[in-house]
Design a protein with these regions (language model features):
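Phosphate/pyrophosphate- and phosphate-bearing ligand-binding catalytic cores of soluble enzymes
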Residues: 16-17, 23, 68, 154-276, ...
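N-terminal flexible segment immediately upstream of the FAD-binding catalytic core
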Residues: 1-38, 42-43, 76, 240-261
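Glycine-rich beta-strand-to-loop/alpha-helix junction loops that act as flexible
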Residues: 62-66, 100, 263
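Acidic, glycine-rich active-site loops and adjacent beta-strand->loop/helix elements
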Residues: 66-67, 84-86, 102-104, 125-129, ...
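A gly/ser-rich beta-alpha-beta helix-loop segment of oxidoreductase catalytic cores
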Residues: 108-149, 220, 224
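Short amphipathic alpha-helices in soluble, non-transmembrane regions
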Residues: 4-8, 48-52, 202-203, 274-278
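N-terminal glycine-rich flavin-associated loop
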Residues: 21-57, 71-116, 143-162
Length: 298
């Protein structure tokens, strides 16, 4: 790792050692990253990834950390913070192009500023453009695949490619990037001309719903379980009497049963044990086998 650090320094790529990962995810859980790399532009990102491969160093690409549960022991290897990249948004007619590190909130506000409709559903989803494309994020009847047209990414072979959204196998909380280890660099979205007042009203309406129904006052990673076919995870959990159910510092939210929250001092082990208990009870009582939506990074 010393050789790796020397090369980062030579390339003027910022990094920290033993960086607490709890500070870089919305769950506020996780031990230290051996190295935490903070590329400031696309070139530095590509260089950092290439260096990891050259030195056979294990790495993980991190956006806003809004769908992540880091292990208590941390991450042995390199965590690359994509959210530190230049947050650039370009608008041309009805097309928005955004870097992977752009926050979804900023993307939605850019669309509003230019009177473009189609991203209202994403307002209030925590995270970055890269993370949202990676998992085909969605809410309130909309998904990224509805407006995504093309993606630029760094392929495993080291070359930058641009592919149409149709080739990304976009479906419920899934994209091809889960399998091909590509690093998303930027994405392009096609929107529709709209009335700014109507767009603003829709964004405000959906944000009000979030504030009313979701436990945004407590650390979490958003929806904990994927929606099973023909049902809703939160309803099944509530039906089984698990509202407020606890394990250590982790609990099923009293406000929304689809969320597991950190009540203070929760560990990764607490969250995983709670999820296992909830899954077992729901399976026994309803027959549904819940699948975790949050990503566990060890």
């Amino acid at each position: 790792m010393e050789r790796f650090k020397q090369k980062l320094q030579a390339a003027a790529i910022p990094f920290r050692e033993n960086e607490p990962l709890a500070a870089h995810c919305t769950f506020k859980i996780g031990g230290p990253a051996q190295l935490f790399v903070m590329p400031e532009n696309e070139q530095q990102l590509c260089s950092a990834v290439a260096l990891c491969k050259e030195q056979a160093v294990r790495y993980y690409l991190l956006g806003n950390g809004s769908n992540i549960l880091f292990a208590d022991e941390g991450f042995s290897g390199v965590v690359i913070d994509v959210s530190a990249l230049d947050a650039e948004i370009a608008v041309e007619d009805t097309v928005l192009t955004a870097g992977a590190g752009v926050r979804l909130a900023a993307l939605c506000k850019a669309a509003l500023k230019h009177g473009l409709s189609g991203l209202e559903f994403a307002y209030g989803i925590p995270g970055t453009v890269g993370g949202a494309v990676y998992m085909n994020a969605g809410a309130y009847g909309g998904e990224m695949k509805d407006v995504l047209t093309t993606v630029r990414y760094l392929a495993a072979e080291g070359e930058v490619r641009e592919v149409p959204a149709a080739e990304l196998d976009l479906r419920y909380r899934h994209s091809i990037f889960e399998e091909n280890s590509g690093c998303i660099l930027s994405a392009q979205f096609h929107l529709q001309p709209g009335n700014a007042a109507d767009i603003r009203a829709k964004m405000d309406e959906l944000m009000a719903k979030r504030l009313d129904k979701q436990p945004l006052d407590k650390p979490s990673a958003g929806s904990t379980f994927k929606r099973p076919a023909g049902a809703f995870a939160a309803a099944l959990i509530d039906q089984c009497g698990l509202r407020g159910y606890r394990h250590g510092g982790a609990a099923v939210s009293d406000k929304h049963c689809g969320f597991v929250v950190n009540l203070g001092g929760a560990t990764c082990a607490d969250v995983l044990a709670l999820c296992d208990e909830v899954r077992a009870i729901v399976k026994e009582k309803t027959g549904y086998d819940l699948e975790k939506e949050i990503r566990v990074v060890r």
